[in-house]
Amino acid sequence: MNRSILLLTLFLFSCSPNDNSMQENSILHDEKLRTFYTYVPSNIDKEMTLVVGLHGYTGNAKTFIRKGDADFNNFLEINNFIGAYPEGKSFYANGRRFSSWNDLAGSIGQGPKGDICDIDRDHYPYPPDCVNPHRCSWASCGDDIGFVEKVIDYHKNQYDIKSVIVIGMSNGGMLAQAIGCKLTDKVDAIINIEGMQALGMSCIPKKPLTMVIYGAKNDTTVPPEDILAADGYFYEPMKNTVNEWKNAFNCSNSSKKQISNPAEISEEHFYNCDGGVTITSILDHNNDHDWPKPYKWGINLLFAPILN
């Protein structure tokens, strides 16, 4: 087969849907087949919203979507959104599967403030695609931003997409923020769930972009306030990232909101920013390293600053 035809075939290859709404797809990126899933709502219309969901460390598309009240596809169906679920590169070590995303921090291991981990940090297996990894490196070294860009382009070619929202949990949140910084021409908003980037490496887009960032006080895995995590890694405090974004985009107004039921939440919303974007920080006073709970309510909490 002609090589150009083969590459085109691999780029557009799509498996039969697992059910009436989910499709498994493959794209050739960096000479590797990368997998993503597409959720198609019941009523396809014009000017659709595409939501790209990014799983956390060791996760996959299914662990992001979840089931029951936490089922992300239910949220997409209600709002008539198309969903895309890319999967990070994975490998096996010590009998366990590891998957991760390259947010241009966890793969590097060292930033402007020095090493991103303590001397006695927990050890994570080095991804095989990393050559001579730094001692603090733990995430894939692949071009995940380019991969997600291809996933976005794929859906724009298939559907009438008006806006793109990228949402990620933990390591997926780190990548969501990195995508917001690198792909501002293709993304309209990001939602970072407990994905504080490495200390000194929290990026800011060159163009205004709407962001929602969520952290939980009892989260010791990727803490939103304390710099040092339980595993010995250093993370940029959430308030620093929020301040840098709202200052960069000249947000002139803000409002605060306290929620006590069903969860204790402190929310600060910055608006009247350049380009009409908004910046929202959500601090959960009781949660740990998890989505805001109860889950169905929590998904709406995260999207409300963008959709309302």
Q: Model segments located where?
A:
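Sec-dependent signal peptide recognition
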Residues: 1-8
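Active-site nucleophile loop of the alpha/beta-hydrolase fold
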Residues: 88, 191-199, 216-220
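Primarily recognizes the serine-hydrolase "nucleophile elbow" in alpha/beta-hydrolase
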Residues: 153-209
